[in-house]
Each structure stands twice: as C-alpha cells, then as structure tokens.
Amino acid sequence: MPLSYSQFRRYRACPRQFEFSNIKKIPWGISEGESFGASVHVALKRWGELELGLRTEDLGQRTSKMGSKKESVREDQLLLFAGEHHGDTHSSKLTAQSLIEIWHQSFVFNTFPTQFEADFARRRGEELMRRFFAWWSQVPRSVVAVEKGFSIEIDASTVTGRLDRIERTEQGVRIIDFKTTAPCTQQEADADLQLSLYALAAEHLFDQPCTELLLLFLSDEGTVERSTVRSASQLKDARTQLQLIRERMEAKDFRPTPSVAACKRCPYRGICDVAAV
C-alpha cells in the first residue's frame, strides 16, 4: 500500500498519532494555523500556474515541431527543457496586485471562530504575499511545475508526495518548499528527511540530480531561506530510514513517544492518555 510522506511524518512525531489517524481513522479538526497555511499554499500554487500559463503556447509550438519524437519524451522532461529556454517569467500579468487578488480567491475564512480573526488572517496573508512577491522578483525565474505529485519506490515500499514548486536554474533543478511556521535552523534543514525524499523524487521525475533544496519561510517579518543539498550517501541513508519506519508500521509498533513539543502540535492530545500537555 502506498504511503504519503505526511504519514511517515506523523509516525515519526509519535507512532500513536499515526495509529489514531491512519489505523483507527479518528477524525480531527483542522486548526486555524493549518487552515491559514493551506490557503497560502493554494495561492502560491495558483501563482505558479499563472507563470506556467504564460509559457504554455510557446511550449506547445516547440513540441509540435518535434513530431512523433515527442511521444518518447516524458512530459516532465519537456517542461524542464522549456525552462532551459525561458529564464524570465516576469511579465505585466505577474504583479503584486494580481498575487493579492489570487490570495483573496484562495483564502478560506470559515475555519476561524470570529469575523475579526478571519479578517486579521486575511490581512496577514496579504502582507505575506507582498513579502513573497518581493522575494520572487529578485531574480528571473523559470518555473517547471507546481504541486507536482510523485510516486517512487523505496525498496518494497511506494512513497508518494507533492513538490510545492520546481524551478529550472543554470545549475539544474531547484525544489522549493513553502512554510508558514517559524524558520528551522540550517542544521535542521541539512538533516531534514522530507527534503531528502524530495531530492529522490526530483531525480526520479527528471532523470538528473536535484541541485538545490530550498525551504522558504514566509512570515510577517519577511522571508527566510534555508538552502541545502543532498549527497549520494545522504540519499541512501534516507532510503534506509524510510524503510525502517515502514517496517515498524507493518509490525504495528504504535508505542507512544510523548514530548511537550510533539504533543503540543498533536490533534489528538485531548484524547490521548499519555499526552505531555
């Protein structure tokens, strides 16, 4: 059975959280922070789709000239090839105001308890969009895909997930993951298992190594980047870690590992008898 990285993340946070969510199927309510983060991701996905839309006609013209040859070229590689020829996606349609409008269309307000809190979150999102636009405008960008799904084999397991944004750079492929949480340290980014999985996914999708993994943290104070790479040995270690976690899942090892940090973020802390908070 395929497993998403979010399932691996829940198990790593606490095996009981995984058990409640994926084995016992106990529902949980989405928090205001999760709702806000989801709205930000939707807005940036639509922004990336707007970028891609500006190149669709040109890509179609060039691939049509390839005739029957294009049938043997994967769609992902065609998009990457397109990125090699179009480094600058900035145009009159890609403005800060258009991004704000996309945010208004993407923002989900009904998870907030009051209209005041919803309005505050909406205005906060506007500021985050401005911060993102300032970051985005710094250099020409060539987006290859947004919210790109993947499915890769890790030993006997299938692991699925989505890449927030993929860009083509002069060096190769850059994977960008958006965050609305507090920034992690550089050491945490360098050791992050999710980013290692993303590097494996990029190599699978494009038949070439990922040259940069970038965590982009969006906050009221601005944007914070955590850029990292993965070596062959790190990718091998990531495969081993994921397989070991899968084996523990299959062995039904759901012994809880409570901690203040994990329990504070757990949606099941109200029903768990060993919750640390």
Residue ranges of model-derived segments:
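C-terminal, charged and often intrinsically disordered regions of DNA end-processing helicases
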Residues: 1-34
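Mg2+/Mn2+-dependent nuclease catalytic core
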Residues: 148-241
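Polybasic (Lys/Arg-rich)
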Residues: 234-267
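Hydrophobic (often cysteine-bearing) scaffold residues that line and stabilize catalytic clefts
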Residues: 32, 36, 40, 121, ...
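Short cysteine/histidine-rich zinc-coordinating motifs and their immediately flanking basic loops
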Residues: 275-277
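Short cysteine clusters
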Residues: 14, 263-266, 272
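Solvent-exposed, amphipathic alpha-helical segments
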Residues: 39-50, 244, 248
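A non-catalytic, helix-rich entry segment at domain boundaries
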Residues: 43-147, 153
